[in-house]
Amino acid sequence: MIMRNLLVTLLCIGFWATSANGQLKTTETEDVDIIYTSPLHKYLLPQLVSTFTNSYNFHRNLFGYTPTENISILMQDFGDFGHGGADALPTNNINIGIGPFNYVYETMPASERMNWLMHHELTHIVTTDMPNKRDRFWRGLFRGKVSTSIDDPLSIMYSYLTNPRRYAPRWYHEGSAVFMESWMANTKGRVFGAYDEMVFRTKVRDNAIIYDIVGLESEGKTTDFQIGVNSYLYGTRFISYAANTYGPEKFIEWVSRPDDSKAYFTSQFKKVFGVSIDQAWDNWIVWERDFQNKNLELIRQYPTTPFRPVSNKGLGSVSKGFFDEKTGKIYLGVFYPAEVSQIAAVDVQTGKMEKVADIHGAAIFFVTSVAFDPEGGNLYYTMDNGHWRDLWVVNVNTKKVQLLIKDLRSGHLAFNRADKSLWGIRNSDGYSTVIRLEPPYENYKSIKTFGYGGQFDEYDVHTVDISPDGSLLSIVKVDMNGIHRLMHIPMSKALKGDFSGKQIFDFDSSAPENFVFSTDGKYQFGSSYYSGVSNIFRYDMALDTVVAVSNCETGFFRPIPYSEDSLIVMRYTGEGFMPVMIPNQEVEDVSAVDFMGWDIYDKHPIVQKWATKAPPDMDLDKIVIHEGDYNPMSTFGLASIYPVVQAYRDPKWPAYGARMNFMSKLGLNKGDLTITYSPQDTIAQDQKIHFLGNMKFNIITGPLAGSWTFSGGKDASDFYDLFGPTISSRKGSFFRTSFSKTVDKELPIKMSTGLGVYGGFEELPDFQDRVAAYDKFFSGNLSFSHYKARRTLGSIDQEKGRIASLSFSSTYVPHDTSTKKMYTKINGNFSYGLLLPIVDHLPFWIRTSAGYSLVGDDHSTDPNSSFGEFYFGGFGNNWIDHQGIKRYREYYPFPGAGITSIGATNYVRIMGELILPPLRFRHVGTPFFYLNWARMSLFSSVLQGSDMYSYTDDGEKMIRFKNIGVQIDIRLVLFSYMQSTLSIGYGIARGYIDETSNWHDFKPETMISLQILD
């Protein structure tokens, strides 16, 4: 009866949620189900279906892949730049952002974006989903591919058995996809990337570290200014080396999953290549150093350009910069390790750098889009660069900042000194639109929107600049074949939406980047990988000629006109881009360098056959089998089922059973049902069977948008109760519903609310060992949280900012007419952190909390007093845990005192926490299992309050407690993918209760805990 009612309730909720997501649309063929968020995006369907079909057929033939399910694609416009993501767990799905790509430094190819996305993302799907005989057995046994669940860690083992190739490092997945994308697009890919060549050429030139496999994951992706991009760089480079050395066919054999293949990616590598992956990686590093030394010799055939550093270190990622003659400083956005992203001012003579304004939501590589008004001293810049960009302005003299337009979605800003207008390129709904803003920059006007699709020769634009007299607009156009053209357009024509003009120079397949006018308007300076190395080029407006003004060993970018005879440019280094001064004079010549990609192309002709033909025009009416509103429940069904082991109320009472997982395509709707049985005679007969069910809905459009969760259970068991000391399972039945959403994205503020009904409980739901005097009660809560904390590159925790929350909770106990009562509690928390200027990554946090219980007047003998109290004590971590590493930061733990041993109706708590810099392990372990980092935190807190339910002769009982503690955390990585954390803590506490008038020393507490799936 209980299970039937629970299932009926959850299904009814599911059908309700179906209608709430009705604004989503879907178009389905036999192979793909495309879900899109706006009817404005429907124009992309023919191109997407065509490129998907073309790429999918190629992958299936090359890898011998036979799909057992169709693929779901979510097509959305949640960010300003195009991007993609794919996963094969538990179902095959792809998520694509339809915006134009970010072409900065040619880190992305300029080929048609849907074609490129399908080449790349389908490689992920095919190489991770492809099963052999053993995988198919486990998928059949568990009724699907198993996703890991933090609630039941045994799912880790089941997930690996059903999809072993999913469990490989990111460099393996991204390197494979980049390798395939490059050949499928007929050499237009990052295997031929000049940026990639520059990165490793610079490492060899500077004799810098080229990480091994473990070091890349433990240090390279976290402390380097390029962070996660290193997975693409290293993965592409190593896989290209392996293919070049052993043959591209060996690569296909390695990433495929035939019946005789090994499950783990390193074991399969040894089987295919006959050498361990560690040895092959070492061989690649030796080869790389030799290859790049030869390239350096080619560059040095001609005199290299001398330079004078402007700063004493690399600045990580940098934006476009401006030199202000009034202050003698350059202004630009910077984003580098151990510092928060910011608008910075760098003194050209001294190199001293100071912060002008913080940048929230900085981007890797370009940081922010900027434009400068030298007369007013106003610098315009964008924030939230990973989503919908906002336009801000800061005065570089007063450092006063102001938000101009929220969600403008524009970048490539340029300031017209002639009429004070601001120009930019806005990305929306897959289109690029040139826009213009007039003072006070509160609204914009669309000048020209570039079309998208095969019928348009030019479909994207970037890199805008305006001549000093305002008569000429410079812009780069991109065509469907990935060719960039630097154009000069008379402003009189541009204002009318006519962007036909003069092509300045044919840079062949290399993109002209960051071209800016000199202050006198006679020249334009920019960079290009024309020779394979990024150098600075000068265009003479009068002579109509282009000459190279640098010959650099690494790469020069983002020129800033300084004087007639000098330029400031950004030189690539291992620490990022460093501003340097170079002479403004033509160089003798520059030499081309070699690319590994072309070596593969010439040495292994088979890759030339991997170039896909142009996607065919397709008649959607003939292949579409369904079109209309997207109904998540139409694809809702069983995703997997597997055995579980849990415990009920005591680690000594294990319970055995099964968990069933349900899911719709894309995971918008999820559900699970766990049924376990406790065979122990010590458990009452009516408590031996345990039920727990959950339904989760993510509604992304409409008035009900947000996250909804519905949970119900009876005598529910819990895996982590097998270990203690915190026990989560309770006797009794319950039904809860909760809802959360972000109500203000700018501040930001998140709202959460919930309702619950409980019956048969002997203990409070949230506090073990605290008796619920009456076993039937109702609860409700409403909370608001604010999170504005930031971390610097290379950190492992939030380092500065503020975190706040305010919550209201009420429990209604309908005991009887005389004692039924509402127990309401108010809780507020505020934390503030700052970086100490002693060493890098040394934050100090002040964490405060206060609570007040509205207990009323008659409370001295209330039998339900526990509902109105706050309880404190202990670290709270179990031996094996999942609820957070730093539990002591919450208001209710109190390391050094027993769990829930302290009770209060009103309290104030203050904690100080010092987080020491992390210790990173460059190579401790193997790709299968390794250590990532270790850190230590020191904390101390004071708790003072009163307990209105406990009286002394002088009134309510006053309590005072203090503690001091330390916690060490060690990050562990399993399967090259799964992160866990081993924590060791020690706390000492003392308490003062006024009825004893003495301080009481608690027994010191030691905590050891392994956090699963952190």
Question: What is each of the regions a protein language model found here?
Answer:
Residues 538, 656-664, 685-712, 727-745, ...:
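Feature captures outer-membrane beta-barrel proteins of Gram-negative bacteria and organelles
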Residues 91, 113-117, 131-245, 249, ...:
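Acidic/His/Gly-enriched intrinsically disordered linker/tail segments
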Residues 25-28, 53, 225-229, 253-378, ...:
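Beta/coil-rich, acidic/histidine-enriched accessory regions frequently appended to metallopeptidases
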Residues 295-316, 346-368, 383, 393-414, ...:
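Multi-bladed beta-propeller domains
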Residues 22-163, 169, 221:
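Juxtacatalytic substrate-recognition/specificity segment
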Residues 717-718, 725, 737, 766-938, ...:
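C-terminal outer-membrane beta-barrel translocator/porin domains of Gram-negative envelope proteins
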Residues 311, 324-325, 331-338, 369-375, ...:
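Beta-strand C-termini and the immediately following turn/loop, strongest in propeller blades
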